[in-house]
Amino acid sequence: DYIKMMRENMVDGIILGTHMLAETEYQNLDLPIVALDYRVAEDIPTIYSDHNKGGLLAAGEILKNDCKCVLNVTAVVTDKSPSINRHRVFSETLKKNGVKCIDYTWDTKQKTEDYYQQMNELFDKYPEMDAMFSEDLIIMNALKCAGERGMHIPDEFKTVGYDGTLIAKMSYPSMTYISQPIKELADTLVDVLLKKINGAK
């Protein structure tokens, strides 16, 4: 329905927060489009934060806590998303410093309510794990699993979340996290889109 609405020129432009259609579908809309954290097509601007810096900050947090076996959990499976770079940088930094880092791709096809079960399976599979890096929602489930297994947080299990969402701020035990500059990203998205709209006119 929203594609029909856009094709009938009921909107002046689009900010893509999620990628749902084929690239050609967006290009055929003939509307100004800006994407958040996903490279839809060469002619569609992509706005994203400094994921390399985010990966370095997260790795630094792990290194200063002398962790031995770290799980690097990503829900990103494509190079089209710049966010995959934070996990690459994180993993490379730990390995260069002699820390065991296991790179794991999260099954995003599962429902959110099934994340806890998937996390429990990870703890069973990697009993030597003493730290984890991932997005806030996944880390929240990790903290719950670790606590229920009697692990002392953060002495026995260290986590670093990424995004700085409300979930991270309300987490218990409290979560260490890297915040994305949400306001700056939003301002840039709107600014770029308005320039495209005005340019088109």
Residue ranges and their predicted role:
Residues 1-13, 88-94:
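Amphipathic helical "hinge" segments at domain boundaries
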